[in-house]
Every structure is written in structure tokens, then in C-alpha cells.
A protein has these predicted regions:
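N-terminal alpha-helical interaction blocks
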Residues: 1-59, 155
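Short linear interaction motifs
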Residues: 45-48, 76-81
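Residue-level signal for mature regions of secreted extracellular proteins and peptides
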Residues: 56-61, 88-91
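Short cysteine-rich clusters marking metal-coordination/redox-active sites
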Residues: 65-68, 95-98
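Cys/His-rich zinc-coordinating "finger/knuckle" motifs
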Residues: 72-75, 105
Length: 155
């Protein structure tokens, strides 16, 4: 069975909110993503010690280099994630297409993806509109005090 995730991550890969702000954001997300049965979906808040991949999973079909605009082979990215277990000390990698350094957060994914040390996610949302609206994402950003990026994943 497949799982679907809708996540919000900071636009700065190293930024983390306060625990209090994260708890307030979680409470807000639970209100806008109600789960009447209490068993279908799961809301999680994660503070990561290292920069962590938060990608679109099976939705990713194409990655483009921010330096030379050539396609980056998906198997290169999959190998990178496997080798690092999706965790990074540095936000920079050497891309295979032009053998230059690029920021992880600068890689151009066809489905929004990112890298972060904080994530708030809803697994298998049950409401009709499964992603955050612009207003909802903006409200979470205001609670946390930092701009956010939305990631829709199919795992």
C-alpha cells in the first residue's frame, strides 16, 4: 500500500523553530486536517540533527542541475540518498552533469522537494483537499516565524 505525505519545511535548510512554535503549528495543522475517526492519518513534527531529504518520493520524475540546466540522472540521486541515508552535514554536493558543487536546496525537482532540519507532515490526509492551501501554509509559516515550502510525497 502506498502512503501520501504533505509536508511543510523551512526554506533555509538549517533553520529550526522553537519547540513552543512547533507545538503551536502542530495544533493548527491538526485543526485544519481533521481526522474524525482518529485512525486514518498521522500528523508529525520532526526536528532533525542533520540536514535531511524531504522529497516527493515516487512523484519525482526529473531533477535538473542548477548550474548547467542539464538533467541529473535519477539513479544518481537515489544512490546519494541511499549512501547518506538521506542525511547530510553539508548542504552542498558535487553534481554529476558538470562536476561542480551545488546546494542541495538548489537542485530543481519536477515535484517540489527539499532538505531541512525541521518538518511538519500529515501522512495519508483524509480531508478532500489533501495539500495545504496557500492560506494554511502561510498561517503555519507565521506561527513558526519562517517561510516554508510544501512537499507532496508518494512513498
Amino acid at each position: 500500500m502506498s502512503d501520501f505525505y504533505v509536508s511543510l519545511i523551512p526554506t533555509d535548510v538549517n533553520w529550526q523553530p522553537t519547540s513552543k512554535a512547533a507545538a503551536e503549528a502542530e495544533a493548527y495543522v491538526r485543526r485544519v486536517f481533521p481526522d474524525p475517526d482518529g485512525v486514518q492519518q498521522d500528523v508529525t513534527v520532526e526536528f532533525y540533527d542533520r540536514i535531511t531529504a524531504v522529497d516527493a518520493g515516487e512523484n519525482i520524475q526529473r531533477i535538473t542541475c542548477p548550474r548547467c540546466d542539464h538533467d541529473i540522472p535519477l539513479d544518481w540521486y537515489e544512490d546519494l540518498i541511499e549512501q547518506t541515508e538521506g542525511e547530510f552535514d553539508s548542504p552542498n554536493v558535487t553534481v554529476p552533469c558538470c562536476d561542480t558543487a551545488a546546494g542541495l536546496d538548489a537542485l530543481k525537482f519536477d515535484w517540489p522537494s527539499g532538505f531541512a532540519r525541521f518538518e511538519i507532515a500529515v501522512a495519508n490526509p483524509v480531508r478532500g483537499e489533501y495539500e495545504f492551501t496557500a492560506d494554511e501554509a502561510g498561517a503555519v509559516a507565521a506561527i513558526l516565524g519562517h517561510p516554508l515550502r510544501q512537499v507532496l510525497a508518494h512513498i
